[in-house]
């Protein structure tokens, strides 16, 4: 579950940062270099570096990303459509929006799963403290 969460956060961060840079007028290769350095994930940094090399060699951005297998196919297809229609930044923002909502939903699920676990753990700790307090008293009463 945590791996899935980290992957979705990385995709959201990548698409949002790249979209913002493109909207600001930064050329694609330079934007990819900046995004690579801010990825915060070595696997995604490598994929972004490979994608930049592919773009430099005349490929579309979506092709090397799809080959890597690290990005979901929906992401690479939407990026491909954005490149073909000239609306790459819009598609990137839509991907970011989708993955932000996915991350929120996953965090809510994790929170709902962790609450009972924390309650049981706290019950065990309190029980242990109570037993630790009463054991000496019980042993003293058996001596008398």
Q: Where in the sequence are the language-model features?
A:
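Bilayer-spanning, highly hydrophobic alpha-helical transmembrane segments
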Residues: 101-144
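Residue-level signal for pocket-adjacent positions within structured domains
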Residues: 1, 60, 66, 135-138
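Membrane-cytosol interface motif
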Residues: 1-7
